[in-house]
Amino acid sequence: MPIIEQLGYLGLGVSDLEAWERFATHVLGLGVSRRADDGAFALRMDGHAHRFLVYPDPLDDLRFVGWQVADAAALDEASARLERAGTKVTRGTAEERADRAVRDLVKFTDPGGIPVELFHGPAMAKEPFRSDVVGSHFVADTMGLGHLVLSTRDRDACRDFYMEVFGFKLSDYIICDIGGYHVDVCFMHVNKRHHSLALGGPMPKRIHHFMLQVGAMDDVGLAYDRARDDGVVIENELGRHPNDRMFSFYAQTPSGFQFEFGWGGREIDDATWEPTTYHQISEWGHRRPPRRRPKT
């Protein structure tokens, strides 16, 4: 059984805080839960005090990933596993614990160069979350904020690291050629969500995309309309994946990496699950939108 329970939070470094706040609240439907003097802010979507930490930073990329474990004993065990695997582990400072609003955390860098934090005891919100634009709810809470797809220099080494050190379980692979690109992505899970982590090849940024799941199909369509109305660059139109069965679309965040907004994701029962390999990214849809040609 994985020692990690869920994808807890993402730390993002962004160059345009104002654009990110509008995007996160108006397009995605998240809520601002905290602001700092330097302009940084936190975003919530469920019972947790926050799921995203957004900092002023020209990086425009992922700064760190936070994975939740059950308690102090699990954090100590995870740290010991990392050290046995030859990975340097450092304890989070009091300032970092306060910023993340967690009881304790440790930090390390994974084989792909991604800064990772393990934590326990997240602060919970005092009031239920109600989105201003999402009519149903975000499928999060005990399944975590959603999923993320990371860039890796050595996909297999990263896959083995997460599976052997933390007990991540293999969901499946997608291997295919599309649009002149070779796609080879590994999907892994830590709870019943089909995947909380997917690993691809080298990409311009650390993160390819994060995914948020909602409780009603119409909320995906409404988010698609909001994104288009706000001038958000749509990367892939509405479609459905064959592996996790997610009905979704992809578009750009203000930082250039992507997000996926979906509904209907498959849940895994480890007692019966058999990993497989798919040879298409989508069963239907997820097409690149036509680009307007300049007038001559």
Model regions and ranges:
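N-terminal beta-strand motif that seeds the catalytic metal site of vicinal oxygen chelate
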Residues: 1-18, 62-67, 123-156, 169-171, ...
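Core segments of cupin and vicinal oxygen chelate
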Residues: 2-50, 150-194
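Vicinal oxygen chelate
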Residues: 6-15, 57-153, 184-188, 231-296, ...
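Conserved active-site tyrosine of GNAT-family acetyltransferases
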Residues: 20-25, 82, 113, 158, ...
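Conserved donor-binding loop and adjoining core beta-sheet/short helix segment
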Residues: 35-38, 45-70, 93-95
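Active-site beta-strand termini and strand-to-loop segments that position acidic
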Residues: 43-47, 56, 108-111, 188-192, ...
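Short, charged/polar, Gly/Pro-enriched secondary-structure boundary elements
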Residues: 48-53, 113-116, 194-197, 257-258
